[in-house]
Amino acid sequence: MAEEQKAVEEWRKEKDKYFTYDFDSPIPHETRHKFKGLLYYPYDPKFRIAAAVIMVKSDEIIQMVTSKDTNQPYRKFGFLEFTIDGKQYRLAVYKRAWVQENDRHLFIPFRDTTSGRETYGAGRYIDIEESKDYVIDFNKAYSPFCAYNENYSCPLPPRENWLSVEIKAGEKNLK
């Protein structure tokens, strides 16, 4: 088993533990005893993709609409361009507007053609770190907390991050 696959599987186990036992789990306390773990597509190396970054030089704050029809401030970091099955795609990448300048966390909200069928209808997220080489690992795509609990307010992927391809990787709908 590849090292990347082992890391993803370990990440999934830790997430299940968090959702099952942590006080801050998004699974409502009254239904947590029924929670048997999250559902995922099998790991697929096809969806661990090297991407080219196109930086955006702007301090403009973007107000991302949330599931509660409020706004959360983000700064556009740039775009990641990548290829799946010979076709090129592009996703906007964001930084939270309220974090420290040295925070290297990047946020990629997206939808694909599995959204609303096999995966959460409002979309999924991927977190990556700033680096000189970028890899998007869709095997780590996850549903926002509002997929499990309506009390959460989650950013909705902007239209520019709606992909016209099936991403059969990462987290699936919880049944």
Predicted regions and their residues:
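Extended, aromatic/histidine-rich regions of cofactor-dependent oxidoreductases associated
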Residues: 5, 133, 142-175
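Surface-exposed peri-terminal alpha-helical interaction modules
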Residues: 35, 49, 55-64, 71-74, ...
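Extracellular/lumen-exposed scaffold segments
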Residues: 30-35, 58-76, 90-93, 155-163
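Residues that act as N-cap/strand-start positions at coil-to-secondary-structure junctions
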Residues: 34, 43, 74-76, 120-122, ...
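Acidic, glycine-rich flexible loop segments
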Residues: 109-142
